[in-house]
C-alpha cells in the first residue's frame, strides 16, 4: 500500500518535491501552498497549477497552524508530512498529525545556512559549494536530524537564478533516491552538529545597497546574488538610482577613494580593495537595461565622478533610539551599552535621573525630565524624530498590582497604547517590553513565545492586572504588525544586577524580591519567605539581558521584525529560598559585612499577609530561549552566583552611603 502524504510546498522546489512524491508512488492527500504575492516577481513554477493538473486538493490558508486546519489534516491520517520551500514554520501539533514523521527539504547543507534565502546568502558570502538537505522537522526551524544531502558546486558565473535551478535539480535527484528508502524505513538519521550551525534571516531589497568601501569581491558576490529576477544591487548617483545587473572584479583601484569612477569605458568604480566593472545595469527601477558605457552616459558620469555612498569624510547618521523610562533598571543599563557604540544616539525621558547621572555628560545622550502622561507633545515629536522607540515605563512590582491595580492599568496599558499608536502614525520601529508574567500559570516545562498558553487567575485576583495589561498590548501590537508596524516584543525573565531598585523602594514593599531580601540583611530583620519560598524563577544577569536587547536593536538582517523573544537564563533556576540562602552566604563573606546587624533568620509568611487577598503566585517560570539563540545568536553566560554577588555589592554600598549620611 502506498504511503499517504500531506505536503506544504511553494516555488519551483515545491513543484519538484510534489513531482518526486508522485513519481515514487506516494499518495498525496492534500497540498498546502501560498497565494502568490502580486508585489513579487514570480519567476518560479506554480504549485497550485501543478496540483490542479494532477487533481490534487490544494489549499492556501493564511494560517495552516490554526486548530481547524490541524483537525482537518489529522482526519486525513497522513503517514508523512513534507515541506518543500513552504515559507511558514509548522507547529508541533501540526507535525504530530503525521504517523511516521514530518520532513523538510532545505536549500543548504545543514547545519550551515539555516533560515531564509540560503541560495542568496551563500552567494553573498562567496561560498563555493552548497546543496540540499532532507531532514526531520522539529520545533526549531531547520534543526532536526538529517536523512540525506546532496552537494551543489557553485561556479563563479552562478547567480541567484542559476543556483536556484541547480538546487531544484539536486532536490529532484535527492528525493528520487531518498523517498523510496524513507517509505521502506531504510534511511538513517544523523543529528545535526549544533556547534557548526549558522543562521541567516530573510533578505529585503534594501540589502542590495552597494557600499563602495568594501572589497570589490564582496560587491561582485552581492551583485550576482541579487541580480534578475531579484531587485538588484544598487547605489545612488545624484538624484537617480543605479541598479547593477552584472559586474566583474578588476585588480587594483588606481589609488582612488572608494566610490570614485576610474573610467567610463569600461565603467569601473574604485572599491575599498580592487575595483568593480559594471557590465550591465539601468537607471532607476524603470530604466532601460544598458551596457556599462551607455549607462555612464545616461547618468552623466565622467572619469573622477563620485558615486553617493562613497566615503566623503562624513560619518553616516547615528541611529536615534528613544528610551522612555531611561532612568529605570533596563533603561539606564541599555543607554550605557548603546553609548559604547558610536552608531547610536540616545534620547531619554523619565521623572528622575539618579541612575543616569554618569551618562549625562556623554555627547550622544540627550535627557529630559518628564512624565509620559504629561509631556505628550515632546514624546510625539521625538517618536517622529527617532528611528527606534523603547517604551520602558511601567509599574512592575507585585505589591502594586494588588494595592494600585487601576494605576497599573492606566500607566502600563493606556499610556503605553498612546506611544504604540504614535509609532504606527509615524511608521517607527517599536521594541516593546512584554513580560514573563504574561505566561501566568502556564504549565509548560519551558515557556515558549509561539506555542505556550497564557493562563491567568480569576478576576478577584488583582495581581494579574499587570499580566493582562501587558498581554493585551502584545496582542494590539501584533495586530498593528499585520498592518505594517515594525515591532519586536521582548520578555525579560527576572533580570537582576546593580541599580535594580532602591533600598527605599524595598522599605515600602515596592521592589523586586532580591532587593527586599537584601534590605532584610542590611537592617537585621528576618528574611520573609512567602509561602515557604518554594516558587522557582530563572534569574538573568542584567549584562546578559542588555546584550540580547542590544542585538534586537541592531536587528541584523531584519531577523527580529515581527518576533517575540524571551530573554532569560533557564540554567539559573532557583527557588526564592535558595536565592535567600545564596545571598546570606555571600553577605557573610562580604568585606562590608561588619557594618551591619546579625542575621535574623528566615521566617515563613503567608503571601496574603503581605500582598493581600488579591495575590496569587506561580510555582515556576522557565523560558525557552530558542528564539533568542536563533534570531540573535545569543545565549546567557553569567552564573547566578556572580549576578547575586554584583547585586548584593551594589546595595551594600548604597547602604553604606545611607549610614554615612546619618552620621
Swiss-Prot record:
The record lists the catalysed reaction(s) as:
UDP-alpha-D-glucuronate + NAD(+) = UDP-beta-L-threo-pentopyranos-4-ulose + CO2 + NADH; UDP-4-amino-4-deoxy-beta-L-arabinose + (6R)-10-formyltetrahydrofolate = UDP-4-deoxy-4-formamido-beta-L-arabinose + (6S)-5,6,7,8-tetrahydrofolate + H(+)
Keywords in alphabetical order, please: Antibiotic resistance, Lipid A biosynthesis, Lipid biosynthesis, Lipid metabolism, Lipopolysaccharide biosynthesis, Multifunctional enzyme, NAD, Oxidoreductase, Transferase
Instruction: Name the source's superkingdom.
Output: Bacteria
Q: Which GO terms describe its molecular function?
A: carboxy-lyase activity; UDP-4-amino-4-deoxy-L-arabinose formyltransferase activity; UDP-glucuronate dehydrogenase activity
Binding site residues for NAD(+): 350, 371-372
Q: List cellular component terms (GO).
A: membrane
Hey, where's the site called Raises pKa of active site His on this chain?
142
Which Pfam families does UniProt cross-reference here?
Answer: Epimerase, Formyl_trans_C, Formyl_trans_N
* InterPro entries tied to this protein: Arna-like_SDR_e, Bifun_polymyxin_resist_ArnA, Epimerase_deHydtase, Formyl_trans_C, Formyl_transf_N, Formyl_transf_N_sf, Formyl_transferase-like_C_sf, Lipid_A_modif_metabolic_enz
Q: Which residues form the active site?
A: 106, 437, 621
Biological pathway: Nucleotide-sugar biosynthesis; UDP-4-deoxy-4-formamido-beta-L-arabinose biosynthesis; UDP-4-deoxy-4-formamido-beta-L-arabinose from UDP-alpha-D-glucuronate: step 1/3; Nucleotide-sugar biosynthesis; UDP-4-deoxy-4-formamido-beta-L-arabinose biosynthesis; UDP-4-deoxy-4-formamido-beta-L-arabinose from UDP-alpha-D-glucuronate: step 3/3; Bacterial outer membrane biogenesis; lipopolysaccharide biosynthesis
State which Enzyme Commission number(s) the record gives: 2.1.2.13, 1.1.1.305
Site Transition state stabilizer — annotated at 104
Region: Dehydrogenase ArnADH, residue numbers: 317-663
Q: Can you tell me which residues bind (6R)-10-formyltetrahydrofolate?
A: 116, 138-142
The entry marks the following residues as binding UDP-alpha-D-glucuronate, namely 396, 401, 435-436, 463, 494, 528-537, 615
Q: Which GO terms describe its biological process?
A: lipid A biosynthetic process; lipopolysaccharide biosynthetic process; response to antibiotic
Query: Where is the region Formyltransferase ArnAFT?
Result: 1-307
Subunit composition?
Homohexamer, formed by a dimer of trimers.
Provide the function of this protein: Bifunctional enzyme that catalyzes the oxidative decarboxylation of UDP-glucuronic acid (UDP-GlcUA) to UDP-4-keto-arabinose (UDP-Ara4O) and the addition of a formyl group to UDP-4-amino-4-deoxy-L-arabinose (UDP-L-Ara4N) to form UDP-L-4-formamido-arabinose (UDP-L-Ara4FN). The modified arabinose is attached to lipid A and is required for resistance to polymyxin and cationic antimicrobial peptides.
Q: Which family does it belong to?
A: In the N-terminal section; belongs to the Fmt family. UDP-L-Ara4N formyltransferase subfamily. In the C-terminal section; belongs to the NAD(P)-dependent epimerase/dehydratase family. UDP-glucuronic acid decarboxylase subfamily.
Would you tell me the protein name for this molecule? Bifunctional polymyxin resistance protein ArnA
What is the organism field in this record?
Pseudomonas fluorescens (strain SBW25)
Amino acid at each position: 500500500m502506498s504511503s499517504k502524504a500531506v505536503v506544504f510546498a511553494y516555488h519551483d522546489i515545491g513543484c519538484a518535491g510534489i513531482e518526486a512524491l508522485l513519481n515514487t508512488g506516494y499518495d498525496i492527500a492534500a497540498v498546502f501552498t501560498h497565494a502568490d504575492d502580486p508585489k513579487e516577481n514570480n519567476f518560479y513554477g506554480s504549485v497550485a497549477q501543478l496540483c490542479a493538473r494532477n487533481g490534487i486538493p490544494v489549499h492556501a490558508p493564511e494560517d495552516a497552524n490554526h486548530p481547524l486546519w490541524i483537525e482537518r489534516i489529522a482526519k486525513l491520517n497522513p503517514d508523512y508530512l513534507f515541506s518543500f520551500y513552504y515559507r511558514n514554520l509548522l507547529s508541533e501539533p501540526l507535525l504530530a498529525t503525521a504517523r511516521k514523521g514530518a520532513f523538510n527539504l532545505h536549500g543548504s547543507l545543514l547545519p550551515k545556512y539555516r533560515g531564509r534565502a540560503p541560495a542568496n546568502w551563500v552567494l553573498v558570502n562567496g561560498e563555493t559549494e552548497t546543496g540540499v538537505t532532507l531532514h526531520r522537522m522539529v520545533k526549531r526551524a531547520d534543526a532536526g536530524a538529517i536523512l540525506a544531502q546532496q552537494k551543489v558546486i557553485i561556479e563563479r558565473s552562478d547567480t541567484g537564478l542559476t543556483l536556484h535551478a541547480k538546487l531544484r535539480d539536486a532536490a529532484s535527484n535527492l528525493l528520487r533516491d531518498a523517498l523510496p528508502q524513507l517509505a521502506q524505513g531504510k534511511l538513517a538519521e544523523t543529528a545535526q552538529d549544533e556547534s557548526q550551525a549558522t543562521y541567516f534571516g530573510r533578505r529585503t531589497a534594501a540589502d542590495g545597497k552597494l557600499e563602495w568601501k568594501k572589497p570589490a569581491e564582496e560587491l561582485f558576490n552581492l551583485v550576482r546574488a541579487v541580480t534578475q529576477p531579484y531587485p538588484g544591487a544598487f547605489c545612488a548617483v545624484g538624484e537617480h538610482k543605479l541598479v547593477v545587473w552584472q559586474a566583474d572584479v578588476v585588480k587594483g583601484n588606481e589609488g582612488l577613494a572608494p566610490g570614485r569612477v576610474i573610467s567610463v569605458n569600461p565603467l569601473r568604480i574604485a572599491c575599498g580593495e580592487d575595483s568593480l566593472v559594471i557590465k550591465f545595469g539601468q537607471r532607476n527601477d524603470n530604466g532601460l537595461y544598458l551596457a556599462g558605457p551607455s549607462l555612464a552616459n545616461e547618468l552623466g558620469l565622467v572619469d573622477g565622478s563620485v558615486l553617493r555612498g562613497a566615503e566623503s569624510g562624513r560619518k553616516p547618521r547615528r541611529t536615534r533610539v528613544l528610551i522612555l523610562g531611561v532612568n529605570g533598571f533596563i533603561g539606564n543599563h541599555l543607554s550605557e551599552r548603546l553609548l559604547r557604540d558610536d552608531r547610536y544616539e540616545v534620547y531619554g525621558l523619565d521623572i528622575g535621573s539618579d541612575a543616569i547621572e554618569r551618562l549625562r555628560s556623554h555627547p550622544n545622550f540627550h535627557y529630559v525630565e518628564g512624565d509620559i502622561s504629561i509631556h505628550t507633545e515632546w514624546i510625539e515629536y521625538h517618536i517622529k524624530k527617532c528611528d527606534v522607540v523603547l517604551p520602558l515605563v511601567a509599574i512592575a512590582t507585585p505589591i502594586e498590582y494588588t494595592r494600585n491595580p487601576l494605576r497599573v492599568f492606566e500607566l502600563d496599558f493606556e499610556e503605553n497604547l498612546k506611544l504604540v499608536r504614535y509609532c504606527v502614525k509615524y511608521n517607527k520601529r517599536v521594541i516593546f517590553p512584554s513580560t514573563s508574567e504574561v505566561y501566568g500559570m502556564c504549565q509548560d516545562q519551558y515557556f515558549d513565545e509561539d506555542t505556550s498558553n497564557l493562563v491567568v487567575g480569576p478576576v478577584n485576583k488583582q495581581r494579574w492586572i499587570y499580566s493582562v495589561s501587558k498581554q493585551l498590548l502584545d496582542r494590539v501590537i501584533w495586530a498593528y504588525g499585520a498592518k505594517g508596524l515594525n515591532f519586536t516584543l521582548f520578555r525579560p525573565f527576572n533580570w537582576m544586577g546593580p541599580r535594580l531598585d532602591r533600598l527605599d523602594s524595598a522599605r515600602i514593599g515596592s521592589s523586586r524580591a532580591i532587593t527586599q531580601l537584601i534590605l532584610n540583611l542590611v537592617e537585621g530583620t528576618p528574611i520573609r519567605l512567602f509561602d515557604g519560598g518554594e516558587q522557582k524563577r530563572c534569574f538573568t544577569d542584567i549584562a546578559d539581558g542588555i546584550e540580547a536587547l542590544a542585538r534586537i536593536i541592531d536587528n541584523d538582517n531584519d531577523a527580529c521584525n515581527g518576533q517575540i523573544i524571551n530573554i532569560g537564563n533557564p540554567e539559573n533556576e532557583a527557588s526564592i529560598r535558595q536565592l535567600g540562602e545564596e545571598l546570606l552566604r555571600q553577605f557573610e563573606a562580604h568585606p562590608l559585612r561588619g557594618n551591619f546587624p546579625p542575621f535574623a533568620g528566615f521566617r515563613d509568611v503567608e503571601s496574603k499577609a503581605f500582598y493581600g487577598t488579591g495575590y496569587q503566585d506561580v510555582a515556576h517560570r522557565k523560558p525557552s530561549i530558542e528564539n533568542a539563540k536563533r534570531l540573535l545568536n545569543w545565549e546567557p553566560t553569567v552564573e547566578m552566583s556572580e549576578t547575586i554577588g554584583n547585586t548584593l555589592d551594589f546595595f551594600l554600598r548604597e547602604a553604606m552611603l545611607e549610614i554615612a549620611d546619618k552620621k
